[in-house]
Amino acid sequence: MNRIKAVGYENNELKEKAQLLADQLNLQLDQNADTCLFVTPEKLTLKIRNFSLMFADFSTMTWSKRRGEGKKQGLIRACKPTKGIKILDATAGWGKDAAILATFGADVLMLERHPVMAALLADALSRRNEADIQKMCLSLIASDAISFLHSLQEKDYPDIIYIDPMHPERNKSALVKKEMQVLQQLIGTDYDAMELIKLSLSHVKSRVVVKWPQKVKPLLPPDASIDGKTVRFDIYMPQFSSN
């Protein structure tokens, strides 16, 4: 499964909504597709053969437990999210790391260049209630991060840029979560990760944080690293950082 080629729907009442999405993403409308974006009455999901339906979720109920793990998380120690700090998640994926950062009060802008993943993220944002919106400041732009950064004016530079590149596919095992398997197959390797890191260093106020496999050599020598069990967070400081 490398591409999603269709939009499906659970019942005929959802056909019009599914057709609009299919037109928007230039996909076919196919109610019987076994691999597709799948519209249900509750939410937009990703339907993949041999997997249960997958979807993005930004409800505070879901993420309050992860916040409860506190600042011991490598992600939090590396990014140091606090109320009002602006974080650009340049490779949003399922939006899970962005959601965790937002629970600590950060203002997080997600970028996602894959149109299918961007559609799933947008749907998750649209399902939030007022309490979710107040507690987690999340927004989304469906864009390639490199193009977005080139268009950014200096006054709009984020405090932190967070990058979680899709690395070369790991060995298939039960240890690789289904969401990661899907991203690996759908998106593939981010071969422009090095370019993105270098560009980010000239478009950020405080630091660039890169999530990378623990046993894999960093793309660039970091200024600092925070180790986890299977991943680490490499930290890069811009030359003229004031922080």
Swiss-Prot record:
Catalysed conversion reaction: guanosine(1516) in 16S rRNA + S-adenosyl-L-methionine = N(2)-methylguanosine(1516) in 16S rRNA + S-adenosyl-L-homocysteine + H(+)
SUPFAM superfamilies recorded: S-adenosyl-L-methionine-dependent methyltransferases
Q: Which GO terms describe its cellular component?
A: cytoplasm
Q: Where is S-adenosyl-L-methionine annotated to bind? A: 112-113, 164
Q: Which Pfam families match?
A: SAM_MT (PF04445)
Keywords attached to this entry: Cytoplasm, Methyltransferase, rRNA processing, S-adenosyl-L-methionine, Transferase
Q: Does the keyword Cytoplasm apply?
A: yes
Per UniProt, what is one GO molecular function of this protein?
Answer: rRNA (guanine-N2-)-methyltransferase activity
Main location per the UniProt record? cytoplasm
Q: Which domain of life is it from?
A: Bacteria
**Coiled coil location:** none
Q: Where in the cell is it found?
A: Cytoplasm
What Enzyme Commission number(s) appear in the record? 2.1.1.242
Give the family, as the similarity comment puts it. Answer: Belongs to the methyltransferase superfamily. RsmJ family.
Q: What does this protein do?
A: Specifically methylates the guanosine in position 1516 of 16S rRNA.
Write down the PANTHER family for this protein, in alphabetical order: RIBOSOMAL RNA SMALL SUBUNIT METHYLTRANSFERASE J (PTHR36112:SF1)
Q: Provide the protein name.
A: Ribosomal RNA small subunit methyltransferase J
Native organism is Legionella pneumophila (strain Corby)
